[in-house]
Amino acid sequence: LTPEQIDLLASYVYQPPATPPVWGLEQIRASHIVNAAPGSLPDKPVFKADMDNLFIVVELGDHHATLLDGVSFEPIHRFPTRFALHGGPKYSPDGRYVYFASRDGWISKFDIYNLKTVAEIRAGINTRNLAVSFDGRYAIAANYLPRNLVILDAETLAPLQVIDAGSRVSAVYTAPPRNSFIAAMKDLKEVWEIPYDKPAADGSLTIRKIATQD
């Protein structure tokens, strides 16, 4: 290809779609996979190790993750993951479960005790990252596409709420002292605080929008 043809091809690839793709609550629910119901697996690890000294290594190249003994640095278990995981998995407060987010929207919950992926759901088309509430009740996915936040039941990964952001969401994190999620907006001069300790009467989480400067 000539340089001009390369530029034209790049421009074509990067142009926005005429109709924004839809990935709403209906599509999210339809993608939900439960491999093991809550409470159906043993409450003790199937391997011997110091449970307070473990590592999860995310392998980007071949889409696997490895549970590593933090004392000996020997692999305990290596398992396949979704395509192109983000490198920052999140953990349940008790350390038993690890949550992964893939760049194409899949959220996976892995039971470290039983070395098994127990649930998965596709929360978006282009996902930036994932956070888990300090109390272990909620998980939340920050999406570029669609431009929203998706709140999940951390136990089952069932979708609870979709929050339209009107912006790409750069990142979301949990703020334990505030019992809140904090979300950064890409296209708005705002940071959102989403308290998770005081849901509304219908169970939904409310939003506090905080204006920011350049």
Residue ranges of model-derived segments:
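Predominantly soluble domains enriched in secretory-pathway, periplasmic, or organellar proteins
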Residues: 1-214
